[in-house]
Each structure stands twice: as structure tokens, then as C-alpha cells.
Amino acid sequence: MYKNEFNSSWMSSFNSSYIDNLYNKFLLDPTSIDNSWYIVFTELSKENYINSTNKYLNNKFQDSKDTIKLTIELLINIFRTLGYKFAHLNPLDTFKNDNSLSLKKFLKSSEAFRIQDSYLVKLSQYVLDDITTKNVYDDYKNIYCKRIGYQFMHIHNSNEMNWIKNYIETKHSNILKKKKKIQILKHLIISEMLEKYFSSKFPSIKRFSIEGAESLIPMLKEVIKYTKKFNLHKIIFGMSHRGRLNVLANILDKPIKTIFNEFCENNSNNFNSGDVKYHMGFCCTKTIGLRKIILDLKSNPSHLEVINPVVVGSSRAYIDSNDNLNDENILPIIIHGDAAISGQGVVQELLNMSQARGYKVGGTIHIVVNNQIGFTTSKVKDLRTSQYCTDIAKMIDSPIFHVNADDPESVIFVTHLALNYRFCFKKDVFINLVCYRRHGHNEIDDPSITQPVLYSKIKNHPTTATSYYNKLLLKNIINKSFLITYQKKIKKKLDVEYNLHNKKMSEKRLKCCSIVKADYINVSNTPINNISQSDLTILAKKIFSIPNNIEVHNRVFKIYKDRLKMANNEKLFDWGASELLAYASLLNEGISCRLSGEDVCRGTFFHRHAVIHDQKNDSKYIPLKNIKLKQGNFYIWDSVLSEEATLAFEYGYSIDQKNTLNVWEAQFGDFANGAQIIIDQFICSGEQKWNVTCNLVMLLPHGYEGQGPEHSSARIERYLQLSANNNIKIIIPTISSQIYHIIRKQAFSLIKKPLIIMSPKSLLRFPLAASSLSELSNGKFRTVIDEIDNLDTKKVQRIILCSGKIYYDLLTQRRINQQKNIVILRIEQIYPRPTKKLSAILYNYKDVHDYIWCQEEPCNQGAWLYHKSYLKKLLPKHSKLNYVGRSSSASPATGYMKIHKEQQKKIIYDALNISD
């Protein structure tokens, strides 16, 4: 079998001549062959590759113009492919004399193209059309080996590769105008002086300065100015703390006196916790030419790179917000650190999403502020395995432009190149701004302890502004007095701002910064117009009817057939039908809906089927997109297999999108902790830290069905631990009408709060959890649900309080036992606490003193520890509140069905006081 396989493969001797021809083409131009062969040839051993190259070139060499032309093309291709490896990118390296690197030495130093001396002698002596190989070498060395390193030959799309190649080789010699050069120098001086001013006024306060990477400021200035060439409406920035204050002041025009106030904490207040100044976001509108453009820097935590998907999600929200907008109207720019971009996994997650249908935004500009160190670690072998910190960009075929930050004119060139590429191909592009960090990780840190040689060099290295000033001075573009004069001018402006900084912010400013303290403890207080039963029936029939020309899978056909019966009031609405009808009601009123997550189109538990697949031609039909001509937009996307980046994306989407309900569903609630950073740092605390609100809905399937520790618990206890100051809403609905009403409440709520729903699994088709059409039409969301059986309150001896599906286990067993003396109450909203409603219900049983909190989760998990002291305060005097549930456990659940059933039975029997 193996012999036959070998003979039928490309390795067979019968294919040798064909492979030789392909290989010869590959040697001349690696991009000229199919990608599959490109991979094969590049994976050949280095020795064989070099020997083959030598053999080929020596055998084929003839003193003819055609042969030399091909060889020169090979030489040019070497520069395009490997030139970035020899470019002078590091500002801290001594700039060597280019002429010392001869053609022969260059080619021999290249690992991929070593050519024998005899061949080089012949090549160097040959002249073709008055162009010597020396001239070819000099010309292309000048293009590809100066202070910009172009890394793009890995791109598989030949159109993109050729476009970049042509842009570089035709525009590299473009010279900036004198006015532009002076403008760049001014930006550098302003950037440098602001940091020095901060240092002089606040020497002992952290600011994470931009010093060493000042070229970032003229780069971003150029981005903003250059975008007038495009139909751009908004730029959204994401960056960490390094250089943030400088960007806020010089790019987003945040008043410097406000930043001074933040240094002095003059405007600290007690209406929220706030955050450090280098985490705060800012938004402004600038006029560029005749066009206004919005600049928006997102607030972010210290967790590096997690802001990235938030920025892209916010960008997608802007595109989706208006049918007249597209990805040419928005530009996301993410500023990375060199250690973080190669170290943080969320970067890979986001890049994987960059061209996915539900997440693409027409390309992101990635700027790596590569200061060649991560806190105290500077050895590349300790920081990463890849050669370059930007190597991760290759996974999505993005071009990478390395540039020396001490050459601001080169920085401007790659900025133009990156912008043009992005708008032309609608793909991500990377700029590796190779710079250094003049101080320690922060200004009070001494970096010489761990990097003595490096920081000795940095100490004596001139700033970018000084170097560029000297360059312009030599070219007589400016005079000697320019620097001092302009520095005095900037100093005067900074002094004015500093003298104003101790003034308090206006009342208007304070008002817009404050957190709304509205009482929404009962989320059902938001006024909502119910939909009449007849109108709801019409709407349900629309979304549950499938066109006859679509061949539906038998199982899906039955589900939709049952849903039509629900619409006709012949059957109760299950969970999937109620959820879809809630979305339909919003869409019908012009409110858009976006659902995303792993397997949301069908639903992990086969319950949603929002997208119907034609079994004949694999086309898709989405009923919720076909309600009426003018309706809200409905977006539903099966996400990439990710939690952190996808949830962060949806958070970013929700904070900027208006008139849209945004839902993210975890495949199982257990997996949401893969995005714990987003939950902790953004969703639950973003409002209190940054005054940033969101109305994101998180559907987290939760419930103990014996499926093991990773398919049982959404970790209710974690969300309760994070709840405070009315920051989020947490519900555990047990009836299908509840999901219908809470979705509508969330969409219409005037107060934006994240909604965490512990959604069911086994209840999705459970008969007792279904609701009538009347309950959908006339009902409302209930934070607490009273006893549903007709019991005599005077005979009640015990009250069981619970949340979630365990209610039905208790109810079923109680009915079997015909116990009339035990009441079961459901707390459907566990945060904010429904104190008024619960107190009112408990008052009806004021003579009862035996209370049980019953839960499926272990004692140290679930809601018990959170509810314990709270519930005791609501109970009558001399009452006892006992716990019934699983014992404390490090693991959420057992992995054995037998043990699960035994535990579940014990919980039910103990709660109902049944002897086994």
C-alpha cells in the first residue's frame, strides 16, 4: 500500500522532470508557483536548498542577456524577501556603512540564497542595458535595507503582494515637503516637552511616558490628517498605559489642565471608584479639511491587549448602526506592546476573527510600540519563541512594516503605506515601530538594575526630536534658534494650563460623569407596552412559517410545525419559540438584534433554529429577517471558537450601539470563565471605573443534569461576588414567558445595565416550563414567583426558597407525596435583590418559622453564601433558615451520573423532609 501511495505521489520518479521545472521557477520567483508547492520547497533542508541553488545557477549560467536578466530578477527577489532582515531598524544600534556590505557578502550572508563565488564573479562583470549588477544591488538595497523593513513576501494573494511591491518601489523616493518636515519636528518637540513637564511637576507619580517612542505622535497625527483622502467618519483607538497621556493630550486634544487635575486628584469624588489617569478614555471631534472626524480612545484596564477586541467590536457596531455606513467609514487602530502582542493569547483570538463574517471591520491598523523590553525582561529568548514580535501577523497574511522610530520620515512613509493597503484590501496591517524605553517600566523604577548596558546606551542616546532637529539644521530647513524658540512657546502654554489645573470641573462635567443612581431594583419597573394577543399571533405565524420552496430537515420541520400550533394557541410556547418571538417583537418595532456565540444559529441544545438550512442546496433562510420590509436589522453569527475575544467584541459592540439588543451566548455557562477578564474588568466594573455603560445580554446555560464538572455550572457565585452598586442584573428564569419579557425589558430599558441570564438546558422543552400565548401577551417579568398550587396558608409549616430548575424537581416530588404543608418560592432575579417583592410574598406566610434555601450547587458555590444573611433579615423573628444542597466542593459537580442522581435525590428529600 505504501509503495503505491509513494508512486502516486509527487515523490514518484515519473514526476521528476515536472518537479524540476517547478523548482526552477521557485528559485527564480517563489511567488510564481502554487502555494502548495511553495510550502514543499521552503520546507526542504537548508543544505539541499543551497546546493540545489548553486547547481542550478552554475549549470544554467550562460553569457546571455536572458540568463543574466533572470539572475538579476533573482537578486531583486532576494531583497524583497529578505531585505527587512538587513534593514537598520534599531535606534540603539550603530549605523553601519552600507557600502561595506557588498553584493557578494550580502548574498553569502543570506541563509536562503548562498551562491558560489565563481558565479558571482561572472555576474558582477556582466552589464545589461547599462545597468550593472552593482547598480541593481545599490538601488534595491536603498529601497529594502535602510530604516524600513518590508515583510510581505509571505502573503499568498499575488495581487496584494504586487500592490505592496509596486507601492514601495515607485514611492520610496518621495520626499516630504519642507513644511511637512517642520511640522513633524514640532510634533516631536511637543511630545517630548509634555513628558518632561510632567516629570518636573510630578516627579514621584507614575505616568508611563512615551519617551523613546515619540514618533508615535507624528505617526498618529499623520493617520488623522491622511484619512481625509478616504470617506472616514470615525477612528477608534485602543492602547495600554504606555504613552497614553501623551496620546490623550496631543492626539485627542484632552485638555492638559484636566490631566494635571487627574495628577493632583482634584476632582476625586464619591459617586464612583474612578480609575488611574492612564486607563481613562476620551472622545473628541476634529475638523480635517471640510470633514469632521470622531476620535475615540477606549478606556481599558491594565490587562494588556484585552482592549483590542473591544475596539473592533465598537467599530463593527458603528458599521451596523446605519445602512448607509460601511467599513470605509470607520478605522480601528490598536497600539500594542512588543512583549504583549507575542505573549497574550487574546491577540491570536482577535486575529482569527479579522475576516470572519460576523466580526470583520475592513481591516485594523496595528501599531507595535516595540521598546524591546517587557518590564524587566529584554532577552528575546525569554520573551518569545518567534524571531519578531510581529510574526503572529503572518497567520492572517498581513503585511508587516518594521521601521526605525528615530527616523520620523520613514515612520510617515510606512503610515501612508499601511493606510493605503488597509483601505485597498480591507485587511489588517502591522507597523512595528522599533524604539526604546527611556525610563524604567514606570518613572520611579530603576531599569539599570536589570539592564545596565542597555540603559547606559539609552542614557547617552539623543532623543528623536534632537536627532531630527540636527538633521533639518544640516539641510538648512531650520535655523539654530528654532528649537529653543519653539520649546519656550510650548513651555509657556503648559505653564498656563498648569496654573488653571486646580479649578474644579464644571457642574455640567460632573453631571455627565456621574453614575445614574436610579432605583431599578425591580427591573420590571421599566414601562413597556404589551403586544395584543392577536398581533402576537400574526407575528408568531410570520416567523414560524417556512416558504414552500425550502426543503427543511424533518426534525426542524416538526419543531416549526409545533411552533405554528403555539402561534394558533393550540400548544404552549416552549423556550425557543418564546425567545424568537421576543426578538421578532423588537424587530417589528424597529429595534435591531444581534446574537452571537458558538452554535447560536441552531442552538447548542437544538432549541433555537433561527437559521434554517435548505436540505437541497444548502441555502439559508432566516425567518427573523423576513418579518416586514421596514424592520430592525437582525444579525446572528456562529462565532469562532473563542470566549475572551468574542465576549470582549460584543462588549465593545454594546457600549456604542444604540437601538440594538446585543446577546452573547456561551456554549455552556461553564466556558464563560475563559473570558473572566472581560467579565471582571469591563462588564461588571466598566461603569463604576469609567462611566461606560452597556446593555449586553449574556446567556449562560446552567443546570445540574449529571453531565460533569464542565457542563453544569455557569458559576452563579462569581457574578454575585461581582455585583454591587446596581452594576448588573442576574436572573435565573424557570418559565419560557420570563425570557420573552426580560428580553423586551432589556431592549426598552432607559438604564443600560448588563443582563446575566442563567439560561436552562433541560427546561428548554420541559412541559411545566412552557407558557401560554396569553402569558406572553398580558404578562410581565416577575422577579419572584409565589407558590403556584392552591395551598392553605394556615397549614403551611415550611417554606423552600430556591432558584432555577431544581424548583421543578421539588414541585414534582411534593405533588407525588401530596404534601400540602410546604410552600416553594422561586427567586427569579437574584441581583439586584427583589426585596420589596419578596418581603410582600413572605408576609403572606408570616406565621411560618421553618425556612430552607435549596440549591443544586455545592454549599460554597451557587447563591447560598450570598443570600444567607440577606434572607435572614427578611424572615420573621425567631425563624430558622437552613441550607439544603450539595456539600462544599472544589469541583462544581461530579462526573458520575449515578452519584449525581443520588445527590439530587438527597437534596429533594431533605428539602421536603422525606425519609428515604
Swiss-Prot record:
Gene3D superfamilies: 3.40.50.12470, 3.40.50.970, Multifunctional 2-oxoglutarate metabolism enzyme, C-terminal domain (3.40.50.11610)
Enzymatic class: oxidoreductase
Listed GO CC annotations: cytosol; oxoglutarate dehydrogenase complex
SUPFAM superfamilies cross-referenced by the UniProt entry: Thiamin diphosphate-binding fold (THDP-binding)
EC id: 1.2.4.2
Cofactor(s) in the UniProt record: thiamine diphosphate
One GO-annotated biological process of the protein: tricarboxylic acid cycle
Keywords for this protein: Glycolysis, Oxidoreductase, Thiamine pyrophosphate
GO terms of molecular function: oxoglutarate dehydrogenase (succinyl-transferring) activity; thiamine pyrophosphate binding
Presence of the UniProt keyword Repeat in the record: no
Catalytic activity: N(6)-[(R)-lipoyl]-L-lysyl-[protein] + 2-oxoglutarate + H(+) = N(6)-[(R)-S(8)-succinyldihydrolipoyl]-L-lysyl-[protein] + CO2
Function: E1 component of the 2-oxoglutarate dehydrogenase (OGDH) complex which catalyzes the decarboxylation of 2-oxoglutarate, the first step in the conversion of 2-oxoglutarate to succinyl-CoA and CO(2).
Protein family according to the UniProt entry: Belongs to the alpha-ketoglutarate dehydrogenase family.
Subunit structure: Homodimer. Part of the 2-oxoglutarate dehydrogenase (OGDH) complex composed of E1 (2-oxoglutarate dehydrogenase), E2 (dihydrolipoamide succinyltransferase) and E3 (dihydrolipoamide dehydrogenase); the complex contains multiple copies of the three enzymatic components (E1, E2 and E3).
PANTHER family: 2-OXOADIPATE DEHYDROGENASE COMPLEX COMPONENT E1, 2-OXOGLUTARATE DEHYDROGENASE
Entry protein name: Oxoglutarate dehydrogenase
Organism: Buchnera aphidicola subsp. Baizongia pistaciae (strain Bp)
Gene: sucA
